[in-house]
Amino acid sequence: MATNKFLSILLLSLMAFAAILLPMISGQIITCLPGECTNPSECNAACKSNGYKGGACVSMSIGSTTGACCCKPNFKSQDSFKSNDIIINNN
C-alpha cells in the first residue's frame, strides 16, 4: 500500500517536472518586458519594435487590472523547413 502511494507521488512529480522542463529545453521561453502592461496594443507595438512577432498583456494574478507585457518569439519551427535544392548522390 505504501509502495503504491509512493509510486503515485513519484509519477506525479515526474510529470510536473517534465511539464515545466520541456518548454525550457525546446527554447520556447516567453520574454516579458519590464514594467506594467495596461494597453495590449502598446504592448504589441513594443514587442514588434524589439524584433518579436507580437505581444500581449499577461495578468500575473487573478483579478489584477495590470499585467506584464510578454512577447511571442519570432522564429519558425525546424519542422517547417522546406528546401528544393537538396542533391542526392547515389555513387
UniProtKB/Swiss-Prot annotation:
Signal peptide residues on this chain, from the entry's feature table: 1-27
Keyword Transmembrane helix annotated: no
Main location: secreted
Subcellular location: Secreted
Keywords in alphabetical order: Antimicrobial, Disulfide bond, Fungicide, Plant defense, Secreted, Signal
GO cellular component terms given for this protein: extracellular region
Family statement: Belongs to the DEFL family.
Protein name, per record: Putative defensin-like protein 83
Disulfide bond entries: 32-71, 37-57, 43-69, 47-70
An individual GO BP term: defense response to fungus
